[in-house]
Curated annotation (Swiss-Prot):
It comes from the Bacteria. Carbamoyl phosphate binds at residues 56-59, 83, 107, 134-137, 266-267, 294. GO terms for molecular function: amino acid binding; ornithine carbamoyltransferase activity. This is Ornithine carbamoyltransferase. The gene is arcB. Belongs to the aspartate/ornithine carbamoyltransferase superfamily. OTCase family. GO terms for cellular component: cytoplasm. Its main location: cytoplasm. L-ornithine binds at residues 165, 225, 229-230.
Length: 308
């Protein structure tokens, strides 16, 4: 039984195994209707719980479709239904769910909730997102880079904006997949030192550059994310926009990167805030391939978790 809690907690060879599996499964589905089962149906007879304390579109749809394509069934549970940690303990919830399902995916706010779920579950647990990390997204991003440009090892990845949970998982991936990483954003939104330190300990070049044009110079991949959350009050939104406006990914900034550089955004996006529509719909952008690859990467993760 394998939990998938964070990229840095998984062996590099096993990450490579998952990545190769994701590429193979995507290729095998070429031309097939979306609702058609995979030929081998590895999840036939299996039940997967999808827990959403924090709501999502891409995570819910991609996991649900992925389980069904592999022949399994899903049970989707919202935060209101679960009341995690309010009443029944997370530990007891994990033990009970383990009697009903074969695999648990949880998208939650606090990392502690994920870790407690994994500690007490007797079935594999997948991190669908926490406020600290988002490993499933980064597996999809690495997959997307590989299918467009080949190995990501030795490449320069630049993150522009807020050093959030997706940025943190990129730093974990830098250490595991062997690419260099530059962050450009305001000092108040730097990624946590723990994540920067991990990548550096793995021998990767990690830099923080306040000038976005200098940061993006020679980049192979430029990545950004939303500046605000749907839950942020208006005052916080205005403050963050003022902080982050200099780090918008626009055509002028992308012109500083390599001519064949890619642009990624995990979506949903606030168009013409963190990135302009000209970039999102332009020749560097692979954002919709990136979104699709959530499906294939997560299918590979589920197979690995179950030893299939």
């Amino acid at each position: 039984m394998n939990h998938f809690l964070d990229i840095h907690k998984t062996d590099t060879a096993e990450l490579r195994q998952m990545m190769d599996s994701a590429h193979a499964m995507k290729a095998a589905r070429k031309g097939r209707p979306k609702g058609q089962f995979d030929e081998d149906q590895p999840l036939a007879g299996r039940m997967v719980a999808l827990i959403f304390e924090k709501p999502s579109t891409r995570t819910r749809v991609s996991f649900d479709v992925g389980v069904r394509q592999m022949g399994g069934q899903t049970m989707v549970l919202s935060g209101k239904e679960m009341q995690l940690g309010h009443g029944e303990t997370i530990a007891d919830t994990a033990r009970v769910l383990s009697r009903y399902v074969d695999l648990i995916m949880i998208r939650t706010f606090e990392e502690a909730t994920l870790l407690e779920m994994a500690e007490h579950a007797t079935v594999p647990v997948i991190n669908g997102l926490t406020n600290r990390t988002h490993p499933c997204q980064i597996m999809a991003d690495v997959m997307t880079y590989e299918e467009h440009r080949g190995p990501i090892a030795g490449r320069k990845v630049v993150w522009a904006g807020d050093g959030n949970n997706v940025c943190a998982s990129f730093l974990h991936a830098a250490g595991q997949f062997g690419f260099d990483f530059t962050f450009t954003g305001p000092p108040t939104l730097d990624p946590e030192a723990e994540f920067v330190g991990y990548a550096r300990e793995k021998g990767r070049r990690v830099s923080i550059e306040r000038d976005p044009a200098k940061a993006v110079a020679g980049a192979d991949l430029v990545v950004t994310d939303t500046w605000v959350s749907m839950h942020d009050p208006q005052s916080a939104r205005e403050r963050r926009h003022n902080q982050l406006r200099p780090y918008q990914v626009n055509e002028a900034l992308m012109a500083q990167a390599k001519p064949d550089a890619l642009f990624m955004h995990c979506l949903p996006a606030h168009r013409d805030d963190e990135a302009t529509s000209a970039v999102m719909d332009g020749p560097h952008s692979v954002i919709f391939d990136e979104a699709e690859n959530r499906l294939h990467a997560q299918k590979a993760i589920m197979r690995w978790c179950l030893g299939l």
